[in-house]
Swiss-Prot record:
Binding positions for substrate per the UniProt entry: R22, G23, A24, G25, R65, S137, K138, A139, N214, K215, K240
The reaction(s) this protein catalyses: alpha-D-ribose 1,5-bisphosphate = D-ribulose 1,5-bisphosphate
Record EC number: 5.3.1.29
Leading EC class: isomerase
Keyword match Kinase: no
Pfam family, one: IF-2B
Name of the featured protein: Ribose 1,5-bisphosphate isomerase
Stated family: Belongs to the eIF-2B alpha/beta/delta subunits family. R15P isomerase subfamily.
Alphabetized GO MF terms: ribose 1,5-bisphosphate isomerase activity; S-methyl-5-thioribose-1-phosphate isomerase activity
Length: 324
């Protein structure tokens, strides 16, 4: 008999796949919540049965989005603690409590990290700054909102972020706080870089050498910022650092459906020898980045390895908690 997985786990997994749940931080908090719901609603009669369910739920969630490392790092946070409890002979209710408590702890820490990044990053924003941003990052928005709330006169240039228009979400959110916003097409980034003082963007994953994997278009903005000698600041929680890259693993870049770029009905009329490629992310080399703002402080890109060793060194010693 297979593991009994609650409906909410499948629903959250599907929402992550379809990008109804989007953004690395929100994805991470959602998978932690999914494990918590599995533990809360499970009808397992033994710790062994619950542990089997948790592993199966984690596998379902793990397969949804390959690039955003926040997802497996959230799973690791909860499942590693659950595995320690299970391996130590915890009874059913103790194991259930461990999962629920660990998930709540992760979600709380994640939300606090965004606040802290805002406080730290705002110190680098000056009165009168024009800031450019790309896609939709809660951490990056926290930096800009905190600076604005401190009374700094700022204006934000928001790129549309094709093909899914996440820039619209960012523009509306910033405007709702009272921040003046200029909304531009992605290809206008270089044109408006000459009036930009700082670039503040988020990250989906950060590698051991300090490279940043983020929404497609990020690297072009960072490149043109370097050309114009404009500071590039990446705002990212430490759970977005990618532990496997310490062992040489490359980050898989997710390829999404061509119909996100060209509507399906139109695409059917196109010549068959035209391929539409739709990578969701690109890689920005560390030399295009000035600083990474984390909840632990501001670091240069080359110090990413230190964060990884401190936060995830333990993860390299074991198989994934849901694999054995």
């Amino acid at each position: 008999m297979g593991a009994m997985i609650v409906r909410e786990v499948y629903e959250i997994a599907e929402k992550i796949k379809s990008m109804e749940i989007r953004g690395a931080g929100k994805i991470a908090r959602s998978v932690a919540q999914a494990l918590m719901i599995q533990a809360e609603k499970s009808t397992a009669k033994s710790p062994e049965e619950l542990w089997t369910e948790l592993k199966e739920a984690a596998k379902i969630l793990y397969k949804t989005r390959p690039t955003a490392v926040s997802l497996p790092n959230a799973l690791r946070y909860v499942m590693h603690r659950a595995k320690i409890a299970y391996s130590s002979g915890a009874d059913l209710e103790t194991l259930r409590f461990t999962v629920i408590n660990s998930a709540k702890e992760f979600i709380h820490n994640s939300e606090k990290a965004i606040e802290r990044i805002g406080e730290i990053g705002a110190k680098r924003i000056e009165d009168g700054d024009v800031i450019m941003t790309h896609c939709h990052s809660k951490a990056a928005i926290s930096v800009m909102k905190t600076a604005f709330d401190q009374g700094k006169d700022i204006k934000v240039i928001v790129t549309e972020t094709r093909p899914r228009w996440q820039g619209k979400i960012t523009a509306k959110e910033l405007a709702s706080y009272g921040i003046p916003v200029i909304y531009v097409v992605d290809s206008a980034a270089r044109h408006y870089m000459k009036m930009t003082d700082k670039v503040v963007m988020g990250a989906d994953s950060i590698t051991a050498n300090g490279a940043v994997i983020n929404k497609i278009g990020t690297s072009l903005i960072a490149l043109t910022a370097k050309e114009h000698r404009v500071w590039v600041m990446i705002a990212a929680e430490t759970y977005k650092f990618h532990p496997e890259t310490m062992l040489g693993q490359l980050v898989e870049i997710e390829m999404r459906d061509p119909t996100e770029v060209i509507p399906e009905e139109e695409l059917k009329t196109w010549p068959k020898n035209i391929e539409v490629w739709n990578p969701a992310f690109d890689v920005t080399p560390p030399e295009y980045i000035d600083v990474i703002i984390t909840e632990k402080g501001i670091i240069p890109p080359y110090a990413a390895i230190d964060i990884l060793k401190e936060e995830f060194g333990w993860a390299l010693k074991y198989r994934e908690p849901w694999e054995d």
